[in-house]
């Protein structure tokens, strides 16, 4: 069985309440349920982790190499400046795909740069919760099922 870790960064626990004009009314729990439902027939276990604390995210990334086949990460605001998360992502030997709910290139200038993208296989941005599904499909089709 394949194990994929989905990491969500700061303030994503506020989805459904925070800036619904940008993120919609869907909650993080709803997103997690939709992801699980989409992959219910796969030989796949999806694990979810959310933290508002940079250090906890770093610890989770570092320990993930021994437990998971890949990571899907939405570093949220940390994507724009966290060299520490970037370094943690570079230190592991499993694939990482970065996801953003909103199109970061249509947002404020400071949101248009993702430093963590440098350690990601790719970045999916602007497709809402479906970006997570796209990332997992990519992982399964290109990295896991091929083996």
Swiss-Prot record:
The record marks 18 as: Transition state stabilizer. Keywords: Amino-acid biosynthesis, Aromatic amino acid biosynthesis, Lyase. Transmembrane segments: none annotated. PROSITE patterns: DEHYDROQUINASE_II. It is an enzyme of class 4 (lyase). This is 3-dehydroquinate dehydratase. The active site is at 23 (proton acceptor), 100 (proton donor). Coiled coil: none annotated. InterPro entries: DHquinase_II, DHquinase_II_CS, DHquinase_II_sf. NCBIfam families: aroQ, PRK05395.1-2, PRK05395.1-3, PRK05395.1-4. GO terms for molecular function: 3-dehydroquinate dehydratase activity. Pfam families: DHquinase_II. Pathway: Metabolic intermediate biosynthesis; chorismate biosynthesis; chorismate from D-erythrose 4-phosphate and phosphoenolpyruvate: step 3/7. Homododecamer. HAMAP family: AroQ (MF_00169). The lineage of its organism: Bacteria, Bacillati, Bacillota, Clostridia, Eubacteriales. Substrate binds at residues 74, 80, 87, 101-102, 111. Belongs to the type-II 3-dehydroquinase family. It comes from Clostridium botulinum (strain Okra / Type B1). One of its GO terms (biological process) is aromatic amino acid family biosynthetic process. Catalyzes a trans-dehydration via an enolate intermediate. It catalyses: 3-dehydroquinate = 3-dehydroshikimate + H2O. CDD domains: DHQase_II. Its EC number is 4.2.1.10.
């Amino acid at each position: 069985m394949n194990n994929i870790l989905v990491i969500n960064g700061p303030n994503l626990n506020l989805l459904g309440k925070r800036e619904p004009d940008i993120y919609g009314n869907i909650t993080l729990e709803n997103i997690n349920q939709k992801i699980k439902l989409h992959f219910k027939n796969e030989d796949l276990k999806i694990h979810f982790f959310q933290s508002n604390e940079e250090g906890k995210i770093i610890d989770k990334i570092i320990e993930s190499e021994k437990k998971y086949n890949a990571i899907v990460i939405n570093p949220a605001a940390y994507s724009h400046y966290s060299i520490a998360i970037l370094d943690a992502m570079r230190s592991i030997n499993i694939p990482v795909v970065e996801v953003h709910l909103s199109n970061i290139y249509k947002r404020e200038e400071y949101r248009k740069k993702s430093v963590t993208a440098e350690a990601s296989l790719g970045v999916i941005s602007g497709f809402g919760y479906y970006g997570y599904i796209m990332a997992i499909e990519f992982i399964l089709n290109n990295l896991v099922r091929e083996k």
